[in-house]
Amino acid sequence: MGPTTEEEKKYFTAVLRGTLNLGAARFLHGCTGVNLDILARQPLWEMGENFKHGTGHGVGYLLNVHEGPNSFRWKIVPGGNAVLEEGMITSDEPGYYREDGFGIRHENLILCLKDKKTPYGQFMRFENLTFVPFDWDAIDVRYMTESDVCRLNRYHKAVYEKISPFLSEDEKIWLEEKTRERLK
């Protein structure tokens, strides 16, 4: 990324928080994307902002990119609110768009997996499938909680662990800098 303004950093960070929130969700089996969508939108909603697209859609194999029945959206759509099942891949892509200004969208793919089973039922979770570092130069930690920073640090650690074995030494040095742990 090139230089970013303070305002762009504020929104970049809010959208990033939404991406991290949704990717870290733990939820009971039976939930749909409508139940979880607020996790991605909440940082923007707290600012009185929103984005006018679904937060995510099902992703098939063989490049069948928009494949249902799974999705994340804030609005109930008849026939379009499937229960999130183990093995479903869904995009996690909140955004923010300023007319005559700038746009931001972070996009990860997340895999739905079974988590622990308790007397309350089967819990589910997501696993990230996308491993690309977020640009620290565009992030303003003043708009993040300690929990947000910890989530981002865990994500960046996973990026380094998954990607670095395939890189040259110079590329590893670059990736190490982009994924190094930061403090609030």
Predicted regions and their residues:
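Active-site neighborhoods and metal-handling regions in enzymes and metal-associated proteins
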Residues: 1-184
